[in-house]
A protein has these predicted regions:
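C-terminal motif of bacterial Sec signal peptides marking the signal peptidase cleavage site
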Residues: 7-11
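Bacterial signal peptide processing site
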Residues: 13-16
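Extracytoplasmic small-molecule ligand-binding "clamshell" domains
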Residues: 25-109
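Alpha-to-beta junction loops
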Residues: 45-46, 82-85, 103-111, 156-157, ...
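Bilobed "Venus flytrap"/periplasmic-binding protein-like clamshell domains
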Residues: 65-80, 114, 132-187, 204-208, ...
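Acidic, polar ligand-binding/catalytic clefts
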Residues: 87-150
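A ligand-binding cleft/hinge motif common to bilobed small-molecule-binding domains
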Residues: 113-121, 169-172, 193-227
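Periplasmic-binding protein-like
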Residues: 131-138, 208-247, 269-283
Length: 283
């Protein structure tokens, strides 16, 4: 399972222009023994994210991951006193996110990571920093699939990713034999393009990125049927790190860097910046 991981030590962002980087908190000090103090002292941080999610976490030809998740992660690193070039990016596909946190392969994960009770049995979450909703993506000329209720009537095969919340939820709407699972959403998009499946399901913002990159081949059905709060995955019980991240998020809203992170990434397709959801309790 860990063989699926890939690592990029490149700094993130679509440009090497340092004006696009968040302001680094160089004078910060932390309580001894906390995760924050450990990372500041080490002078580097390992962050898990997606490498195949347009607009949220996508590794470019230059080896640099870009997207909203990447920018949120950079904001946290900056508050730790670490510039973007001190980040080691670790690919964290859906099925290994808990594993890489538990095994210490990353210090935290920002990877379209829905907060739910099952995952909380293994790890803790800071945030949420964004709320998405599950939707469907189909071919642009498809008029039969108008929402999740239409999947059975159309006898449609639908694709999602192993270990993801959407893969579980779609079982309520599609016959089990018609659910196809891969390890990354880009393979689902390929399956839709070749006709192996008739729909792809995950959170609407992820699908929006796939639609944007499809050159008109795909469309979003546009009928979200869940609420998916995205959290930042950390080691279970690390309350102080959770509180630090939550304060970083509220500070980012106050100083405008949260809105900027959106506008520089997903906002290029969906211009209206989201509101920060109500933050969960750290415990």
């Amino acid at each position: 399972m860990t063989a699926a991981l890939a690592v990029s030590t490149a700094a993130c962002g679509g440009s090497s222009d340092t004006s696009n980087q968040p302001s680094v908190n160089t004078d910060v000090t932390f309580e001894s023994g906390t995760t924050m103090a450990t990372l500041k002292s080490a002078g580097k941080v390992k962050i898990g994210t997606k490498f195949d999610q347009p607009l949220f976490g996508l590794k470019g030809l230059d080896g640099k991951p870009t997207g909203f998740d990447v920018e949120v992660a950079k904001l946290i690193a900056a508050k730790l006193g670490l510039a973007a070039d001190k980040i080691e990016w670790v690919e964290a596909p859906s099925k290994v996110r808990e594993e890489v946190i538990e095994q210490g392969k990353v210090d935290f994960v920002v990877a379209t990571y829905t907060i739910n009770d099952k995952r909380k049995e293994r790890i803790s979450f800071a945030g949420p920093y964004y709320e998405a909703g599950q939707d469907l993506m189909v071919k642009s000329d498809d008029s039969a699939i108008t929402g999740p209720e239409a999947l059975k009537a159309a006898n449609a095969k639908v694709c999602s990713v192993t270990g993801s919340t959407p893969a579980e939820k779609i079982k309520e709407y599609a016959d089990p034999a018609n659910i196809v699972l891969f390890d990354v959403y880009s393979k689902c998009a390929d399956a839709l393009r070749t006709g192996q499946v008739q729909a792809v399901t995950t959170d609407n913002v992820i699908l929006l990125g796939l639609v944007d990159g499809s050159k008109g081949d795909f469309k979003l059905v546009g009928k979200p049927f869940t609420k998916e709060p995205y959290g930042i995955g950390i080691k279970k019980g690390d309350t102080k790190f959770c509180e630090f991240i939550n304060k970083t998020l509220t500070d980012a809203v106050a100083d405008g860097s949260y809105d900027k992170a959106w506008k520089d990434t997903a906002g290029k397709v969906s211009p209206e910046a989201p509101k920060l959801p109500a933050l969960g309790t750290c415990s």
